[in-house]
Amino acid sequence: MKCKYILPSIIVLVFLTACNHPKTGDSKQQTGLIFPHGKKITNNNFTGTAYLQTLVAADSLNSISVGNVTFEPGARSKWHSHPAGQILLVIDGVGYYQEKGQPKKILRKGDVIKCPPNIPHWHGASADTAFVQVAITGREKGETVWLNAVTDEEYRK
């Protein structure tokens, strides 16, 4: 019963706090966002520098995880998929999202992306602007399946 209120509450909290953040007038990552920057991601599933702040860890009561991910300019994930899908809430900056076989989408603050289950995709920052997203990932059907790195050619397309 309580679990069905967690996701809507997180979405409302994220958008209320993001909407109240003052503009600085430049395209660089803004400071003062509600969630901490997090720890540098040190695994090989990313190109460039990215940071993760876990907000909600999946457990026996709730099968979703929620994380705030900050990508420095040019940083991106590998191609990957999620057995139960994923939702991305864009908090700041300019980023990219691409599903295999589809054109790359440009993401900006306030955009929401629904990543379908088992569809290979990648996401990350634009070449010259940092990017911040909240990733909401279903874990009930398994963990993220990591694939190949996004090539520089794929990234530039």
Predicted regions and their residues:
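A short hydrophobic beta-strand segment most commonly corresponding to one strand
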Residues: 128-148
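Active-site region of the double-stranded beta-helix
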Residues: 53-64, 73-79, 83-85
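Short acidic-glycine-tyrosine-enriched beta hairpin
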Residues: 101-118
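C-terminal motif of bacterial Sec signal peptides marking the signal peptidase cleavage site
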Residues: 16-18
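Short, conserved beta-strand element in jelly-roll/cupin
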Residues: 68-72, 82-97, 136-138
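Short beta-strand His + acidic residue motifs that chelate non-heme Fe in jelly-roll/DSBH
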Residues: 79, 97-98, 120-126
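A short, N-terminal "cap"/entry segment at the start of jelly-roll beta-barrel domains
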Residues: 20-63, 144-157
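Bacterial N-terminal signal peptides that target proteins for export
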Residues: 1-7
